[in-house]
Amino acid sequence: MGNIHIQTKSKEYDVYVGKESLSHLTTIVQNMQPSVSNIMIISDEAVASLHLQTVVDALQIDRKVFSFVVPSGEKEKSFENFYAAHTSALENKLDRNSLIVALGGGMIGDLAGFVAASFMRGIRFVQVPTTLLAHDSAVGGKVAINHPLGKNMIGAFHQPEAVVYHTPFLQSLPEKEWRSGYAEVIKHALIGDVKLYHWLKEDVQTLADLRDEKLIHILTKAIPVKANIVAQDETEKGVRAHLNFGHTLGHALEKELGYGNITHGDGVAVGMLFAIFLSEQVYKVNLAYEEMKQWFLKYGYPKMPSDLSVERLVQLMKQDKKANAGTIHMVLMQEYGVVNVVSIPDETVHIALEAFQKDMF
């Protein structure tokens, strides 16, 4: 098992990674001061049916424990479910000393975290991720819900008390979710750990390799990349934006295709390829785009759909949180491990995106 210490200006906490990590949950709760009054577990239907009772049983503590379960899917990260969770919290008499446990993937972590951030102006919560993708979202304190006009547009910064990454929970994931989460692993390697990038190319030949000791190795290497960036910039005023590598186009694809019709990781994978494609032009460097494209396709990442309107995607990219005064800002790569936020004119993005779309076919 590997423990990772997270340090930010507002809070310090640990990420417990391994096959026995759930055994830490009771101790974490018992050691909290002031003492936890009661516990609300927020999960989704798919995860709850598999793991909710396991977590309840692991909480060997004399406190009221109740659950709030929403349907599965990114579209459920909505104001309606956010409001309903608050109603459930009030009906079950949560107070300022209560604890919320986020049991699920990134959608649940974001929703539950935002409920914790806003209920009575902020109560404590613990992340219990059940997907590979959540190795990114569970760490760093960004919590949010979606708006019909944009992803993660309503939210806060609210750090968890701990992250309990019990790797056996991941074994029930379908392949598309392994692929989705692996995209964020690749992102962390490309922007912050070149040695990990080369290790992935050598040691992860198929998604089936993302198991057991290799999985723990990946998590204990990828999470510190994010931790180091968050330690420098907790509230995304500077270098934390580097973690959005691949996300400008990725989020636009999610919005255009409809949440649930493309996974977050698949969108980010296409977005990273485009960022590398554009970076070669902007920086006049060779980043081995063709080799990278073949590597991504080997894992089953999608190509950019040929029937999507480039103009529509450009307009959606202008709604990205990094955009400033209607100008697209993208995270581009100077070299492996070195990225920057760059202002890109609409016309440049449009021309590059058209060329990229054609190159995919």
UniProtKB/Swiss-Prot annotation:
The keyword NAD applies. Its EC number is 4.2.3.4. NAD(+) binds at S72, G73, E74, K75, E76, K77, T130, T131, K142, K151. Its main location: cytoplasm. GO terms for cellular component: cytoplasm. It catalyses: 7-phospho-2-dehydro-3-deoxy-D-arabino-heptonate = 3-dehydroquinate + phosphate. It comes from the Bacteria. It holds the Pfam family DHQ_synthase. Keywords: Amino-acid biosynthesis, Aromatic amino acid biosynthesis, Cobalt, Cytoplasm, Lyase, Metal-binding, NAD, Nucleotide-binding, Zinc. GO terms for molecular function: 3-dehydroquinate synthase activity; metal ion binding; nucleotide binding. Binds 1 divalent metal cation per subunit. Can use either Co(2+) or Zn(2+). One of its GO terms (biological process) is aromatic amino acid family biosynthetic process. It is found in: Cytoplasm. This is 3-dehydroquinate synthase. The gene is aroB.
